[in-house]
């Protein structure tokens, strides 16, 4: 009788199967779609539109928006003047790239609780981390439990994340960015 693939909740996209004996490389991609705004804005104030702006080619543009600002139609790259016209009462701060990088480095060090192989996603405009969990998942009760634990711990800190696991970096990255519920 063929072995069936275990049910995988949609919030954790996985290729090709979970909880199997490690036969190759398994890569976790974690994408933080609102990283910059979430590390700057206190969790209790996140219901209000908040943006980070930066100087770009002679004008101020939105470098990051929180979920509330996104719901109002604001998006990264938009001119700050246009954003103010749409949402005059939004909270605005200037982008500090060093702060975002330092916080991502701290998160990477914290994620070493799961594997020693943690690195930054170097794709431009993508705040994320890549973890090689090959041979580590069984220590946490399998891939599903490991990923659920990662997500829960990250979410408790008030950070939105999309997590996926696959056999290659590209597949895991694509699933985290464009997969179901990402």
Summary of predicted features, one role per range:
Residues 164-182:
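Long, highly charged, low-complexity intrinsically disordered interaction regions
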């Amino acid at each position: 009788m063929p072995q069936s693939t275990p049910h995988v909740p949609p919030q954790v996209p996985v290729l090709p199967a979970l909880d199997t004996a490690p036969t190759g490389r398994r890569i976790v991609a974690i994408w933080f779609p609102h990283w910059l705004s979430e590390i700057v804005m206190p969790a209790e104030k996140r219901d209000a539109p908040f943006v980070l702006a930066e100087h770009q080619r002679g004008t101020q543009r939105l470098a990051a928006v929180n979920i509330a600002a996104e719901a109002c139609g604001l998006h990264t790259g938009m001119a700050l003047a246009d954003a103010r016209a749409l949402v005059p009462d939004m909270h605005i701060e200037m982008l500090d790239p060093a702060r975002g990088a330092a916080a991502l480095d701290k998160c990477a060090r914290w994620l070493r609780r799961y594997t020693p192989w943690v690195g930054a996603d170097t794709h431009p405009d993508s705040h994320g981390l890549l973890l090689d969990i090959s041979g580590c998942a069984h220590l946490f009760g399998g891939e599903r439990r490991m990923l659920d634990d990662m997500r829960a711990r990250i979410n408790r800190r008030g950070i939105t994340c999309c997590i996926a696991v696959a056999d290659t970096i590209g597949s895991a990255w694509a699933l985290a960015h464009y997969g179901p519920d990402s």
